[in-house]
Amino acid sequence: MEHWQSLLLGLIEGITEFLPISSTGHLIVAQRLMGIGTISPADKEAADAFAICIQGGAILAVLGLYWKHVKQMLLGLIGKDPGGLKLLFNLIAGFLPAAVVGLVLHHWIEDHLFGLWPVVTSWMVGGVAILAAVWWRKKNPDTSNKRELGHLTWQLALIIGLLQCVAMWPGTSRSLMTIAGGLLVGLTVRAAVEYSFLLGVLTLTAATAKTALDKAHASGPEFAHHFGTAKLMLHQFGAANLAIGGIAAMVSAFLAVKWLVGYLQRHGLAVFGIYRVAIGGIVAALILTHTFSA
């Protein structure tokens, strides 16, 4: 992997991770276009690990932006902020469904859904769903009072967590499902976005840690059977590329998150629905014209 490739992948990760357009789908397409992860099973294993580990940069960006909530939860743990403790329990409730489903179906998802056609399908279905929801809201405006983050209950958080499980299908978008879930249970736009970002920190941290600790199962070079996935990735791509990708993800995620909150409050999700349908159509056309294989 060249440095410019790790920089580009980091920018893609940071920009798309918290937008409702699927970072996983974009990274799969970008890696295919650059020929990364296509040489052997071990190369693909390392590429998948790289894509997950640079999420650490995006995690740091959200921790910095939402340090107030993080501090609140830390104070809650030592009994000094009941609201912070409640928020922490709500995040755990939202995280548990994905943790259980992820542990059970992780390998099946990697084996069957990490292809271009599954990504294209989820991009387009999700885009149409967003546009249909926007149309419905215009015809049936919701005038009821909305909940702020402090009024979220663990039962409602669990519903958001169940919807997050759908995003394990690459291309669906974890942010889309959790923001939509937050709006569904009655949160304000700002509260839904904030909960989505904070839940993302917990979910992505767990996914990154699991990848770093997992044993490689690729049927490639012999070292893949003796070292963890993280070491396999570093052997293939080097520490410098991981650092470049992580820093690029952190900076771009910081800017994307700051922009998204205000944008959604002013304009809603429609543009993301249009984008998802458009990029799904473009990638489908590239596959059908054999520009690259599915």
Language-model-derived ranges and their functions:
Residues M1-A294:
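Multi-pass membrane proteins that catalyze or facilitate reactions on polyprenyl-/lipid-phosphate substrates
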